[in-house]
């Protein structure tokens, strides 16, 4: 960026300088470069904001629903910026969240953890974000009473099938699989907040896929392994309903 030398005449009022526009970008910067810089600045702001939200939640300054909605929105915005039209240029400056924070001297350990895992902590640990429900509609709170909401069970079942079908159709990229797996986990949490065998494997896969770089894909071996773990989780989920 060009440096502007300011020279004042003795009779010149310094207040006039405050009316002069100070350019944010050097004239030599192209529109594409400007867009890349603006995108990186948005990513920077998301990291800082997310870290504050995580800390606020840990201090009980915001409730589960506020936290989940805010973090979910920030994570989606983060992914949109990384997958923008200029993603090739963005990736030159964003090798990883850790490298990005080191480059711009960002201290945000809570945000880094959340961005690496790719889902709100309430989804990861099956923390309920429902404060109330209509009578007869809130039957998914525990497996001990053996009562589950039929609608939520159907949604979770459908999401299991959707993910497995996607893998069989050779879906193997981060942007293809992560949203499907995240939605699957959320739908499972609506049915029950109790842990069950192989649930942790779903979370491991969500985190593992979220850490893939743009352009990286799962290998055939990894796809078979994911399918196998999904089938085990599906059986364990249904065993919980019996």
From Swiss-Prot:
Which terms under GO biological process does the entry name?
Answer: ATP export; protein targeting to membrane; protein targeting to vacuole; protein transport to vacuole involved in ubiquitin-dependent protein catabolic process via the multivesicular body sorting pathway; ubiquitin-dependent protein catabolic process via the multivesicular body sorting pathway
Q: For this UniProt entry, which segments traverse the membrane?
A: none
The way it spans or sits in the membrane comes to:
Peripheral membrane protein
Q: What is the effect of changing residue 44 to D?
A: Abolishes ESCRT-I complex assembly; class E phenotype (malformed late MVB)
- Reproduce the miscellaneous comment text: Present with 1420 molecules/cell in log phase SD medium.
| Subunit and partners | Component of the ESCRT-I complex (endosomal sorting complex required for transport I) which consists of STP22, VPS28, SRN2 and MVB12 in a 1:1:1:1 stoichiometry. Self-associates. Interacts with VPS27; the interaction mediates the association with the ESCRT-0 complex. Interacts with VPS20; the interaction mediates the association with the ESCRT-III complex.
> What is the recorded name of this protein?
Vacuolar protein sorting-associated protein 28
Please tell me the species this chain comes from. Answer: Saccharomyces cerevisiae (strain ATCC 204508 / S288c) (Baker's yeast)
